[in-house]
Amino acid sequence: MISAVITAEDGGFFSHKGFSQRAIKDAFAENLEAGRIVRGASTISMQVAKNLFLTRERTFSRKFEETFITMALEQNLSKERIMEIYLNIIEWGDGIYGIGPAASFYFNKPPRNLKPVESAFLASIIARPGKNWKPDPLTKISEGWWKYLQLILCKIYERGDADIADLREAGVPEERIRELVEDKGQYESVPSPPE
């Protein structure tokens, strides 16, 4: 689950100090191209700060507070503890908070028993928890969302946290699997999920 969340939400989580220059640059470029805000640059640490201590208002003063709280979290907590808090406070759907209730609601199992494709699905909905997902969602998602899950799974494979059987189960094309096996490639951030 952790690998899926890092892949979908914050690829540099274990290497940055709470802020990602690359995410800021990528978000700026994507937002500029779209002419509106379509992507944020919040790291997992920033999201913990925001969800635990701040309101949802979007002001410069609140962003300033978020910056200082994020720095304090990074200085006082391990990355593992920050991730644990994150997984247990974020919303995974209408009224569903925490990875345990999310895994139970969507897949009727505890988080430790999730398959990589199920973890990828849960990671994929973090950005849009209010989309009104139902139990057993993998049978009801669009082709575009499947492609997004496949992309996440390919990145998880590149990180060494999924195997070829997981890719095949998710329907990753054999040609893509061959490419991944030949060259695991460099990690790149995953784009925003489909609308």
Feature locations, PLM:
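Low-complexity, Gly/Ser/Thr/Pro-rich intrinsically disordered linker/tail segments
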Residues: 151-195
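Peptidoglycan glycan-strand catalytic modules in the bacterial/periplasmic cell-wall system
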Residues: 1-163
